[in-house]
Amino acid sequence: MGRKWNNIKDKKASKDANTSRIYAKFGREIYVAAKQGEPDPESNQALRVVLERAKTYNVPRTIIDRAVEKAKGGSEENYDELRYEGFGPNGAMVIVDTLTNNVNRTAADVRAAFSKNSGNMGVNGSVAYMFDATAVIGLEGKTSDEVLEILMEADVDARDILEEEDAVIVYAEPEQFHAVQSALKDAGVEEFTVAELTMLAQNDVTLPEDAQAQFEKMVDALEDLEDVQQVYHNVDLGE
């Protein structure tokens, strides 16, 4: 699959360690999920996914509780979920997911991040067809064969199960996210190193060194935007 998921997560966490930016993004996502449905993860699958993701980034309980309480309190703050698609250096493909309370601001900010870094925004559907929505679950302490056996016994399907350094990474359909986690929890897995719903590129590309440096700068500029929640792409950064 070309991605080392633990390394990607650690890199993101390290980048945001001093600014708590990642906590702010999770706070917004938790608030939106709790506001759109019940503020109880047992009856709100979207909220449960966000909370499972937040665990893998060690988001403080105070951040989570504050966001849920804000939703419970009937806050009138509303966010739109918008997706932008575009191209980076050498035609690299990028998807940007946002939560915004000001569409014009967000569109302008995203467009600027692309254009200032040798990229350009595309129209809806211009790159998304080259990505697959995927649940990615990572764990340690099991082999891929053991994980396969656990999932088979629980009658849970997975697209692929790979070993990555000390971890096992399960790739599954998005709707299987909770089923995969539940089967593994029932088998004694207490902690997940990765828990993501992502857009996975069907084919990764490798860029020349100068183009990759420009591309990473563009991704950083996009991820630094307050309204941007996730940036997906098809570039193998060698993580």
Swiss-Prot record:
Q: Which superkingdom does the taxonomy of this entry point to?
A: Bacteria
Q: Which SUPFAM superfamilies match?
A: YebC-like (SSF75625)
Gene3D superfamilies membership: 1.10.10.200, 3.30.70.980
Coarsely, its chief localization is cytoplasm
Q: Which GO terms describe its biological process?
A: regulation of DNA-templated transcription
Say yes or no: keyword Cytoplasm present: yes
Its annotated compartments are:
Cytoplasm
Q: Does the keyword Cytoplasm apply?
A: yes
Which GO molecular function entries does the Swiss-Prot or TrEMBL record give? DNA binding
Matching entries from Pfam families are given as: TACO1_YebC_N, Transcrip_reg
What is any one of the record's Gene Ontology cellular component terms?
cytosol
Keyword annotations from UniProtKB, A to Z:
Cytoplasm, DNA-binding, Transcription, Transcription regulation
Record-linked PANTHER family: TRANSLATIONAL ACTIVATOR OF CYTOCHROME C OXIDASE 1 (PTHR12532:SF0)
Q: Which family does it belong to?
A: Belongs to the TACO1 family. YeeN subfamily.
According to UniProt, the name of this protein is Probable transcriptional regulatory protein BT9727_0453
Which taxonomic lineage does the organism of this UniProt entry have? Bacteria, Bacillati, Bacillota, Bacilli, Bacillales
